[in-house]
Amino acid sequence: LIHKTFEGLAERGRCSMGWFFGFKLHLIINDKGEILNFMFTPGNVDDREPLKQGRFLENIKGKLCADKGYIGQALFENLFLNGIQLVTKVKNNMRNSLMSIADKILLRKRALIETVNDELKNIAQIEHSRHRSFSNFIANSLSAIAAYCFFE
């Protein structure tokens, strides 16, 4: 049923938990956990793709914390030219580069990102497979994100 519902829209993707069929939700939040911007992409889209689009990063300046999936020299340089410094942990196979103490402390905020994702999944119930139409999926997702804005 889900294949017919999202035919031509959703794709098979891979995450840390394994394979899935559906969409990825990309979030930009501030240091208080407030959602500044979000974007849905098919499951097979590279995590770095939304950051290459200007509209997703509109009005974003300063430091952008991300996980290891966002590491890429071209992306880092592109963001830097737009006034955004990408801060990520170093992959195991990478040379260790010097990181300021402030950036190391900032990387601890990754737990805040995971908390936002957890609340969207478990409290706002954004993740389920009972959608019967694409418009139902969008309505459910947008209402979950709007409801998150009222969480305390």
Indicate where each model-derived feature is located.
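Polybasic low-complexity intrinsically disordered regions
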Residues: 1-92, 145
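Structural motif
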Residues: 15-18, 130-141
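Hydrophobic (often cysteine-bearing) scaffold residues that line and stabilize catalytic clefts
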Residues: 47, 109, 138, 142
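Helix-centered, glycine/charged polyanion-binding patches within enzymatic domains
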Residues: 63, 68-133
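Charged phosphate-binding loop/patch that engages nucleotide di/tri-phosphates or the phosphate backbone
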Residues: 136-152
